[in-house]
């Protein structure tokens, strides 16, 4: 679709990250530069997400986790929050057919109880439509917060210890990972190899703090609506110049 096949790209790069996480930042600033309301940037960001998803799929990426809405984002202006909550409805209506055609499987992490009914219905419909697909997993972090995720996992583990389902000595890193929201992902791809943040901000903002322990980070000043295929390839090229040590020398 974008003129570059995964096979030829793999000859250029030493390796493709199997799991990429993206903090999609800069929609509001992108709109402001164009003298448009912030919501205009969020709408443009949907087009970037579609292109990045298809490109990642062509490259052989297994999981793409995108930070769509954090637990802290509820403090934004109500009209903006309402617009963002409607974005999944618009995005899935417009792009699920092409994502489905490209064998993309849609999943999510996050607390669903606070999501509007229309948002949740659109998300569940997209998940159901693509559930048998075997290609890239497009994993939406929606109403997600890393600290809340870990806190919830600790509560469940503590309850299982109280119920004598677990002994304290059974608690390992692997067991904790099984209580996190990413436990539905394939075991080998639960943790991101590469985390990308757009817009020039240099922080994680509560995105996958447990899973990113050994991730490589790529920060770019490019605003999210401008982060398209060429920018993703640039990020992966940079990743391929890294030596991943996983705490070793």
UniProtKB/Swiss-Prot annotation:
Residues binding Mg(2+), per UniProt: 25, 216
E.C. code = 2.5.1.-
Q: Is Metal-binding set as a keyword in this record?
A: yes
Q: Which residues bind substrate?
A: 26-30, 38, 42, 70-72, 74, 76, 197, 203-205
What is the cofactor note?
Binds 2 magnesium ions per subunit.
Q: In the UniProt record, does the keyword Transcription regulation occur?
A: no
One GO cellular component from the entry?
A: cytosol
Q: Where is the active site?
A: 25, 73 (proton acceptor)
- The enzyme class is transferase
Family, according to the entry, reads as follows: Belongs to the UPP synthase family.
Q: Note the HAMAP family from the entry.
A: ISPT
Subunit and interaction comment: Homodimer.
Indicate what this protein is called per its UniProt record: Isoprenyl transferase
- Species for this entry: Streptococcus pyogenes serotype M3 (strain ATCC BAA-595 / MGAS315)
């Amino acid at each position: 679709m974008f003129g570059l096949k995964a096979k030829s790209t793999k000859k250029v790069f030493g390796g493709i990250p199997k799991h990429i996480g993206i903090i999609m930042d800069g929609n509001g600033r992108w709109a402001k530069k164009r003298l448009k309301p912030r919501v205009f940037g969020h709408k443009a960001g949907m087009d970037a997400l579609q292109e990045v998803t298809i490109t990642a799929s062509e490259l052989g990426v297994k999981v793409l986790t995108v930070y769509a809405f954090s637990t802290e984002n509820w403090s934004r202006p109500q009209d903006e929050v309402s617009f963002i909550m409607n974005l999944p409805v618009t995005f899935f209506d417009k792009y699920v057919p092409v994502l489905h055609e490209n064998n993309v499987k849609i999943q999510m992490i996050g607390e669903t109880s606070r999501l509007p009914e229309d948002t949740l219905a659109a998300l569940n419909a997209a998940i159901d439509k693509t559930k048998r697909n075997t290609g890239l997993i497009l994993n939406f972090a929606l109403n997600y917060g890393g600290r809340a995720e870990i806190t919830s996992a600790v509560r469940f583990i503590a309850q299982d210890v109280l119920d004598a389902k677990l002994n304290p000595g059974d608690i390992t890193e692997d067991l904790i990972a099984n209580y996190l929201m990413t436990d539905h992902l394939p075991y080998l791809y639960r943790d991101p190899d590469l985390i990308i943040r757009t817009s020039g901000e240099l922080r994680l903002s509560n995105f996958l703090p447990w899973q990113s322990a050994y991730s490589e980070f790529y920060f770019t000043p490019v605003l999210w609506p401008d982060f398209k295929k060429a920018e993703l390839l640039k990020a992966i090229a940079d990743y391929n110049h890294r030596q991943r040590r996983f705490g070793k020398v």
